[in-house]
C-alpha cells in the first residue's frame, strides 16, 4: 500500500508543491496504478515472446525526398544572426 508520506517525499524531490487534496488524490491514484502492476506481475508470460509493441507494425513513415532549395539568401535573411552561408546560434556548451 502506498503511503501519503511517500507521495509527499517524491513530490518534494521533484520540486512539486502539492496541496493536501492533491496529495491525497495522488496517493489514491498511484496506489491504484501500483496495485494494477501487482496484478500484471502475477500473469504467466513464460510462453509469450518479448516484444516492444502489442501489434506487429512496420515502418509507417513516409520516404524522405531531398528537394533542392536555391534561394538560400531568403532563408538566411530570416535568421537573427548569420555567418557566411550558415545560421549563427548562441553557444550552448562550454569548453571541455
Curated annotation (Swiss-Prot):
Pfam families: GatC (PF02686). GO terms for biological process: glutaminyl-tRNAGln biosynthesis via transamidation; regulation of translational fidelity; translation. It catalyses: L-glutamyl-tRNA(Gln) + L-glutamine + ATP + H2O = L-glutaminyl-tRNA(Gln) + L-glutamate + ADP + phosphate + H(+); L-aspartyl-tRNA(Asn) + L-glutamine + ATP + H2O = L-asparaginyl-tRNA(Asn) + L-glutamate + ADP + phosphate + 2 H(+). It is an enzyme of class 6 (ligase). It comes from the Bacteria. Heterotrimer of A, B and C subunits. Its EC number is 6.3.5.-. SUPFAM superfamilies: Glu-tRNAGln amidotransferase C subunit (SSF141000). Belongs to the GatC family. This is Aspartyl/glutamyl-tRNA(Asn/Gln) amidotransferase subunit C. Allows the formation of correctly charged Asn-tRNA(Asn) or Gln-tRNA(Gln) through the transamidation of misacylated Asp-tRNA(Asn) or Glu-tRNA(Gln) in organisms which lack either or both of asparaginyl-tRNA or glutaminyl-tRNA synthetases. The reaction takes place in the presence of glutamine and ATP through an activated phospho-Asp-tRNA(Asn) or phospho-Glu-tRNA(Gln). Keywords: ATP-binding, Ligase, Nucleotide-binding, Protein biosynthesis. One of its GO terms (molecular function) is asparaginyl-tRNA synthase (glutamine-hydrolyzing) activity. InterPro entries: Asp/Glu-ADT_sf_sub_c, GatC. PANTHER family: GLUTAMYL-TRNA(GLN) AMIDOTRANSFERASE SUBUNIT C, MITOCHONDRIAL.
